Amino acid sequence: MWWYDHPVGGRRPYLVLTRDEALPVLNRILGVPATRTVRDIPTEVPLDQTDGMPLACALTLDNLEPIQIALCTEKITRLSPERMAMVCTALAAATACGAPAQ
């Protein structure tokens, strides 16, 4: 989790999904914004202070977007393997990956 200085939305937490090995060679990476609006939907992952976040929030994998690595200004925390498993499940729900072909 990083503080990201979004050009439009201002400073907010983002989860960086791009693998560590690719970061040195990319200008844009995949990020997921955190929001204080929690809707309890399958594409969300709730986070709180026990995860190292300053406030309770949720990652909404429906809002996955490319972000500029240069605007990731400060590391907040590293999510646990359990939370990252939840992120993978929410990402699969957001993209319908793993759903039977129709």
Tell what function each PLM region has.
Residues 1-5:
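Short coil-to-beta transition motif at edge beta-strands of beta-rich domains
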Residues 10-49:
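Compact nucleic-acid interaction/catalytic patches
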Residues 51-102:
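C-terminal terminal-subdomain/extension
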Residues 7, 20, 64:
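Anionic group-transfer/hydrolysis microenvironments
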Residues 8-11, 81:
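Alpha-helix initiation and capping sites
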